[in-house]
């Protein structure tokens, strides 16, 4: 999509997120969500891309690097005895490939494909509690997405931390347990 003039920018990303949310209303594979979203973003900006271009964009997801603090922070959390389970809105094969290529160390994951829905629906959390036999009181949810993670985990009364990497304003009515700029901040409160 870069070749077509669409790159991650302050103008494109908010449009992408809004259109992606529309595509996630009804469950379909995340690859299809990405493909359809890419086509809509391009159209929104008056750029023509082919179905193949949109499919290539969707296929590129596993190559996207994690935030630089993520691998080390996950490793440190494991060293401290915390179980690290990813709740993700992507397809299982995409997440497996991302974990492998990024060298992430996790104890498990639950994907939209596993539950047949996308966060902020509660399917990920229901499966998490059933599969890992853990109570809400012993769960700490860490995420960057207010809409997909912080609001629903707060609604479920799960302690959480918003990783506010882009210094966004706190939306009205949202009250995360903690706010940090990155995962290193999180490590300061978890012993």
Model-derived features: where do they sit?
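N-terminal helical cap/lid subdomain that shapes the substrate entry/recognition surface
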Residues: 1-71, 79, 93
């Amino acid at each position: 999509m870069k070749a077509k003039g669409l790159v991650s920018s302050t103008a494109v990303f908010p449009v992408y997120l809004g259109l992606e949310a529309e595509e996630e209303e009804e469950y379909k594979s995340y690859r299809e969500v990405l493909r359809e979203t890419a086509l809509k973003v391009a159209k929104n900006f008056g750029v023509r891309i082919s179905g193949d271009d949109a499919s290539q964009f969707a296929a590129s997801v596993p190559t996207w690097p994690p935030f630089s603090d993520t691998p080390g922070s996950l490793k440190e959390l494991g060293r401290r005895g915390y179980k690290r389970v990813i709740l993700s809105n992507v397809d299982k094969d995409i997440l497996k490939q991302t974990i492998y290529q990024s060298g992430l160390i996790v104890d498990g994951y639950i994907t939209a494909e596993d539950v047949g829905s996308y966060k902020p629906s509660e399917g990920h959390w229901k499966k998490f509690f059933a599969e890992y036999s853990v109570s809400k009181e012993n769960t700490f949810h860490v995420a960057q997405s207010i809409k997909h993670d912080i609001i629903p985990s707060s609604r479920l009364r799960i302690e959480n931390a918003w990783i506010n990497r882009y210094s966004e304003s706190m939306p009205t009515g949202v009250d995360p347990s903690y706010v940090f700029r990155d995962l290193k901040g999180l490590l300061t409160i978890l012993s």
